[in-house]
């Protein structure tokens, strides 16, 4: 029983550290953040920080792995859902983890995490569209459309996050879903 309590406390501390790092990365670059900055922001002692992580870069790496893993799980369910349901799930995840996405879209963040999430989306979109349109579909058209589509979706989501989620989630879902219809119509027109 005591082990579960300790694990829960450890998880709470790690989440506080992750959140502190994310908030700080909206203000300054990773290389300018200190353990003391995180400790102050998370309201923990430095010793507590070092019980969980080696250094700032270890925190960033672990947070990156968690985000990529969770986003990857969402993407694997893409083909099973309508575009509206898929976008709703993605935007739910983003709104539940806004602090991390503010970090991801911050000019102070290294572009590595952003690029890795982008690659995940591009890869899954490629698999999804290949299944939809078959292996004989012109790869050059798919590649161009996938990059356009994923980067466009990211731009809309980044704007939504950086403006404090001021537009209703339903509006973003509807907009992205409607744009998808145009993209799919274009892809079908190129099959002939």
Where do the PLM segments sit?
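Append "Primarily bacterial transcriptional regulators
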Residues: 17, 36-41, 49, 94
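Amphipathic alpha-helical linker/stalk segments
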Residues: 23-27, 33, 63-89, 101-102
């Amino acid at each position: 029983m005591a082990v579960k309590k300790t694990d829960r406390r450890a998880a709470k501390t790690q989440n506080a550290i992750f959140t502190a790092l994310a908030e700080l990365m909206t203000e300054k670059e990773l290389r300018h953040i200190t353990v003391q900055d995180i400790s102050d922001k998370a309201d923990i002692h430095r010793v507590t920080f070092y019980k969980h992580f080696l250094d700032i870069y270890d925190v960033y790496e672990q947070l990156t792995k968690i985000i990529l893993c969770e986003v990857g799980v969402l993407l694997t369910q893409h083909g099973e859902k309508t575009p509206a349901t898929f976008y709703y799930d993605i935007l739910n995840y983003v709104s539940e983890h806004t602090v991390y996405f503010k970090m991801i879209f911050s000019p102070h963040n290294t572009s590595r995490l952003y690029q890795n999430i982008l690659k995940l989306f591009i890869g899954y979109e490629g698999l999804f569209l290949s299944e939809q349109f078959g292996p004989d579909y012109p790869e050059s058209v798919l590649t161009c459309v996938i990059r356009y589509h994923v980067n466009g979706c990211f731009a809309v989501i980044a704007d939504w996050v950086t403006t404090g989620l001021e537009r209703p989630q339903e509006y973003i879902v509807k907009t992205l879903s409607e744009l998808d219809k145009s993209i799919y119509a274009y892809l079908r027109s190129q099959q002939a």
